[in-house]
Amino acid sequence: MNSKFPIKYISPLCTSFLLLTGTNLIRVTPALGIDQHQIIAKQLIKGKKSQVNQVFQPILSKLKKTTQIKILLPTHIPIGKNEPPLYSIVETVTKNKYQILLGFTPDCGGGTACGFGAISAELVSSNTPKPVGKEVNLNNNKKAYFEDFKCGANCSNANLTWREKGVQYTIGLKAGSLSDLVKMANSVVSPT
């Protein structure tokens, strides 16, 4: 074989590549009839996962069935390994709006003990409040506005709000940090 790259390095190189990338690319059930090569190629091109965070799986069908605006949900949620399980609860969903609570109990109504955060979107109209707060940059040259939390007897959500294609999106975390909110916003995907 007339090659400048010795064949003895190919096997370790391929093994290293598979170990580094294979477990993070996809998790596909062959019974679904999904072409794995197409999914891998699309994910490599997009540079992010096409699946939303598993916490949203129980509510996806309700959101998709009701709302007509583009659904954007984060793949990244900054929750510690020792935290209790996180649940998503649809608070409101109409054709032009959705509001999702993130809580530590399946029946959390955003209460102080069980609330973790919130995600919302609404079609921009003349009644939609303009985003307020400190201007920050997201990926793809999107501008967002950070509104810090306030504490009294309890702490409120810190919020990050941006507009995209006529829809205003907000992600909030109870006493959340700007860096966590930016990571969440930069990880949003539209569920497939």
Predicted segments, located by residue:
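Generic short N-terminal amphipathic or hydrophobic helices
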Residues: 6-9, 25, 33
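Surface-exposed amphipathic alpha-helical segments
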Residues: 165-192
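Short, solvent-exposed recognition patches
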Residues: 35-164
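Bacterial N-terminal signal peptides that target proteins for export
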Residues: 2-14
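C-terminal segment of classical bacterial N-terminal signal peptides
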Residues: 20-29
